[in-house]
């Protein structure tokens, strides 16, 4: 009986992982543990066969975010394997972000069998409930143990997973009860592998392709209020679709712009291509300067709202029609509750629209007068920024946002951490992110997992530049414990402002300095050079933009993980930036 259970545990683990690979899993993050041993051993064998990449991580929290970074950069499913108990609870932060940013991640967790539940057995908790509030589905094999699970049950579980991910991308929790014995002898492993290779490895499985059918009535309802002959603006927020669909998204956007002639406001992580006609540079500053003068009757919003108070205020006060198009995101996505929401994506919307119009070259429109005016306003602000932001000046966060896209090679990807960087880049980067893939995890917009996310992205797209503040970086310092993380082609631009600089903009004026530091800034005296050395990561500190350019060239050439630190004086930052903004608004 012992031999039977251990063989069945191993065989079913092989079958489950093999099927998950067939629906798109290419990369697997493995966390330590005993209860998950059959899954780990099976993963190791499939790795030997060249079927899946395995990277280990001793911290489940980092593993979850690392897997999410891989999914975002590749457009493919990624997988995390953990043991039971508190290990599962550590996956929640990454599951929350995967849910809100609509990225496919599978959390495969080992559990105790039913006979050990609710009786005080060690390391036995209600882990099947831990991720349920944010996962598309929580599925399980036979509750008595994986060894009692039938082949068709595993196939059905994977089919449900594939259907859920295809319909509404996001996290899936597969909770797998496994009974002892967890190990398997060399002889039994050899015999089971022979059976698996002979019967299951090359077996063909049918996974029903999910076709997402649009609601033509919903389109017609929206098209009645969508007037191509009236002036409007296209607002493109953070891109939530798959990176594999980015080309078709941009083609649809190009077609939409051609038949409207409307101006386009693009978020730094919108995925919009830099050569799109109608792009308005410095659009947030244009909004701030002319908030009451921009007149049009309709707005076409793509994806979630950008992190801009100026944009939010503009949308709240806007009295015309707002249409919001979402990419496979079926939840409400409009916090100001003023838009007509369309769930089926820009490609679908544009295809039906062009079909209704019988589109041809004659339908193309010149840029509208509003577009020409906004583009000119953006260029005037660009001239001011060019005069004011001089490369030899002292480094500040807003200057980094403006100059780093020019210093980092235009074809190389960038990741922006949450908090200050994404906001500064939205205001000052002048569409500099649109020449490349630019990532920022704006689903839940937390600073969690910053380093692990970047390491995940850099496995797929590199050399990658991560722009992060000191607190966001050190919050996820365990990311360096992910396998071969120091060998990734990742450059970290560490903005050291000795605490949460974003709070200087919000709470400082109403608190005493010591209160402000303790309650919000939370500064940490960290020796960054020694910290880097302890993880065997190369480190440089630079004090001006000339040295920063040289440091970028150095970091790309060595093809390893590198930290480049710049020090920021928050007081000087606030004073300089406010003076610059006053000059722009008053021009």
UniProtKB/Swiss-Prot annotation:
Co-factor binding comment: Binds 1 thiamine pyrophosphate per subunit.
Enzyme Commission identifier(s): 2.2.1.9
Cofactor(s) essential for the protein: Mg(2+); Mn(2+); thiamine diphosphate
Substrates-to-products reaction catalysed: isochorismate + 2-oxoglutarate + H(+) = 5-enolpyruvoyl-6-hydroxy-2-succinyl-cyclohex-3-ene-1-carboxylate + CO2
Alphabetical UniProt keywords: Magnesium, Manganese, Metal-binding, Thiamine pyrophosphate, Transferase
Subunit structure: Homodimer.
Name of the protein in its database record: 2-succinyl-5-enolpyruvyl-6-hydroxy-3-cyclohexene-1-carboxylate synthase
Organism: Prochlorococcus marinus (strain MIT 9301)
């Amino acid at each position: 009986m012992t031999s039977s259970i251990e063989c069945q545990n191993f065989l079913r683990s092989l079958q489950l992982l093999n099927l998950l690979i067939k629906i798109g899993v290419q990369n697997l993050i493995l966390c330590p543990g005993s209860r998950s041993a059959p899954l780990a051993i099976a993963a190791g064998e499939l790795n030997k066969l060249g079927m899946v990449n395995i990277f280990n991580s001793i911290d489940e929290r980092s593993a979850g975010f690392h897997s999410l970074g891989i999914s975002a950069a590749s457009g493919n499913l990624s997988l995390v394997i953990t043991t039971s108990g508190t290990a599962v609870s550590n996956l929640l932060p990454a599951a929350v972000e995967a849910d809100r940013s609509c990225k496919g991640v599978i959390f495969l967790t080992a559990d105790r069998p039913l006979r050990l539940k609710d009786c005080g057995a060690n390391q036995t908790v209600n882990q099947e409930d831990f991720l349920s509030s944010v996962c598309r589905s929580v599925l399980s094999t036979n509750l008595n143990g994986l060894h009692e699970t039938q082949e068709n049950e595993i196939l059905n579980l994977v089919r449900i997973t594939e259907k859920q991910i295809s319909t509404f991308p996001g996290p899936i929790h597969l909770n797998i009860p496994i009974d002892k014995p967890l190990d398997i002898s060399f002889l039994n492993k050899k015999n089971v592998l022979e059976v698996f290779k002979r019967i299951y490895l090359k077996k063909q499985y049918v996974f029903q392709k999910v076709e997402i059918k649009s609601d033509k009535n919903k389109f017609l309802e929206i098209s009645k209020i969508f007037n191509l002959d009236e002036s409007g603006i296209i607002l493109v927020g953070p891109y939530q679709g798959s990176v594999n669909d980015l080309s078709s998204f941009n083609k649809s956007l190009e077609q939409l712009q051609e038949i409207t002639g409307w101006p386009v406001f693009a978020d730094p992580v919108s995925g919009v291509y830099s050569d799109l006609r109608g792009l308005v540079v410095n659009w947030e500053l244009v909004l701030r300067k002319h908030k009451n003068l921009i007149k049009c009757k309709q707005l076409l919003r793509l994806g979630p709202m950008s992190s801009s108070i100026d944009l939010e205020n503009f949308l709240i006060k806007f009295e015309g029609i707002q249409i919001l198009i979402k990419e496979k995101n079926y939840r409400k996505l409009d916090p100001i509750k003023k838009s007509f929401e369309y769930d089926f994506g820009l490609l679908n919307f544009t295809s039906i629209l062009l079909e209704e119009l019988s589109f041809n070259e004659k339908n193309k429109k010149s840029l509208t007068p509003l577009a020409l005016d906004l583009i000119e306003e953006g260029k005037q602000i660009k001239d001011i920024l060019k005069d004011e932001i001089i490369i030899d000046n002292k480094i500040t966060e807003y200057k980094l946002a403006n100059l780093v896209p020019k210093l980092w090679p235009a074809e190389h990807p960038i990741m922006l951490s949450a908090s200050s960087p994404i906001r500064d880049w939205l205001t000052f980067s002048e569409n500099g992110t649109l020449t490349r893939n630019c990532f920022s995890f704006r689903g839940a917009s937390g600073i969690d997992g910053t380093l692990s996310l970047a390491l995940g992205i850099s496995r797929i797209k590199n050399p990658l530049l991560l722009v992060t503040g000191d607190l966001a970086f050190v919050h996820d310092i365990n990311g360096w414990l992910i396998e071969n993380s120091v060998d990734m082609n990742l450059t970290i631009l560490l903005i050291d402002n000795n605490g949460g600089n974003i709070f200087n903009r919000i709470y400082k004026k109403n608190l005493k300095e010591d209160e402000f530091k303790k309650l919000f800034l939370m500064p940490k005296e960290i020796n960054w050079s020694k910290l880097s050395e302890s993880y065997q990561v190369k480190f440089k500190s630079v004090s001006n933009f000339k040295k920063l350019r040289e440091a970028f060239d150095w970091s790309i050439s060595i093809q390893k993980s590198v930290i480049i630190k710049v020090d920021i004086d928050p007081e000087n930052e606030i004073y300089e930036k406010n003076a610059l903004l006053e000059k722009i608004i008053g021009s």
